[in-house]
Amino acid sequence: MIRYLLSTLLLIFISACSDSNDTELNIPTVSGLEKLIEHSKEFEQQVISYETPGGKIHFAIGFGIANSIMVEGEGGNIIIDAADSVYEAERIYKLFSEKNSNPIEAIIYTHNHGDHTFGASHYLKIQDKKPQIIAHEDTDYYVQRIMGILNPIITKRSTRMFGTLLPEEDLINVGIGPHLSVSKSPTGYIKPDLTFEDNLNLNIAGIDIELYHAPGETNDQIFVWLPNHKSLMPGDNIYKTFPNLYTIRGTSHRDVKGWINSLDRMKMFNPEFLFPSHTKPIIGKKEIDDALNIYRDAIQYIHDQTIRLMNQGLYPDQIVEQIKLPDSIANSPYLYEFYGTVRWSVKSIFNGYLGWFGGNPSKLDPLTINEKAIRMSNLAGGNDKLLSELRNAVKNDDMQWALELSDHLIALDYLIEEVKDLRVEALIYEGSRSSNPNKRNYFLTSAFELNNGIIDTSLIDRTSEELLHQISIDTLFDVLSTRYNPEKHSDNNFTVCFVFSSNNTKNITLRNKVAVISNNITNNCNIKILTEELEFKKILIGLANPVSSIANGTIEIVKGNSTKFLQFLNKFR
């Protein structure tokens, strides 16, 4: 049934809970991680208060992955970034209110990521007057996309990257924060009600605020300039680690050139206080200017040298081996690879300009995974010899080679339990020794999954209707089209029409094994449904049963019959 169609919709990242029967990884204690362990001090949980020329600013760090900032105004305050969960927002605001308990007049999202937006609903619950929600005009589009068609895969990969399944003692940090807390409470995203394209000047609670579009880590990124406070909030365009020019959880191309331009634009304001959304503030004009220069120069170097070598005809894997940061900036603490890496960035820049094909003819239409595995086995002298090579690789701590060999044996489905155990050993070895938290957590979580099964992304809180009001019906129908199972296709040109009480209308036509979505009701409806948007949303995520909804009249079938409608819903899985 469609009950589990959108089972991951209400949560971007799943709970960091594990069953008592889960197999432990026995992650070893290794040397070489001293800098990463020391980096955890960057996120010591606290609220720091600053007296700026324009008034007090309070900075909460260490509560989940992202910082939250409160600026005091006249009879009211503003929040910049609302934390990664309602749970953390509640904890943060308890401390903020001890500093100043005036009502929150506005919440500003610096961009769409959940660690900056998912705590917002807490502020609607604690006061009668709804705070104004301010963001770039594209922010809601990107939130809807992540909570829509990309949700299942982003959920899985984010869980791996942030290590939310790992025992607390094995999670050192996540590079830009101590941990991700989004799973501890329902998602609290609230749609913006004031948006802008390039810049916006406001005065809220006596605070002069200038907002500027600053594409970088996201296309909708903004920075906040408070001229009277001499303070700038750069969002995620700078933090104390090498930038995530590409994130391994998966992302559309990040405009690296735009990121450089945004950092240059920030420099023009010559701020005295820089309050990033991750890691600690930077205080002092020179200190801020130096940090911004190092950051933008590093990004430009990686960008320009990738382009230079691309134009010489080198393939991505060749370019990766040639680009290292210049000695003059390589040892800056702002460029330690605790989040992004130079290698991943090079590949992303190449892909952003030229796409997935690196130029090597052998990679254009390569052998299938199974074909290559068979030929590797033949080359080794058979499956037993290939397995012997894998055993030797693990024995000799040649773990990257072990992972690649295990790929072939898994494709061959050969002695899968032993191969799995060897692969787990290789993943733990590589992950536990990595000083990059993204890689470390991804590898260790992948090992956990091999031992305990793939993440069950249906483990979510289905009880909250609040988020459904923030998710558009358009988003849900987009998801429907991507969940249509062509193996269940039977009726060509079969159309189901939906008329919602909001006066919105939707058609789904099944033809040529695709589900075609349109907004205008046709005269060719095989089934016609009258209902409320919220009721249909609840059905899609499993909060309501379509059989019960038909029986109690919250779904009315005015053309066709319930059997056909239920059969139709069952095609989307």
Language model segments and positions:
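Active-site metal-binding motif and surrounding structural segment of the metallo-beta-lactamase
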Residues: 43, 49, 53, 75-76, ...
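Feature captures hydrophobic
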Residues: 392, 398-404, 408-411, 420, ...
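Accessory terminal helices/loops
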Residues: 21-39, 151-158, 164-177, 181-182, ...
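Conserved beta-strand hairpin/beta-sheet module of binuclear metal-dependent hydrolase folds
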Residues: 44-100, 223-236
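Sec-dependent signal peptide recognition
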Residues: 2-8
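Metallo-beta-lactamase
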Residues: 77-78, 84-86, 142-213, 258-270, ...
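C-terminal motif of bacterial Sec signal peptides marking the signal peptidase cleavage site
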Residues: 13-16
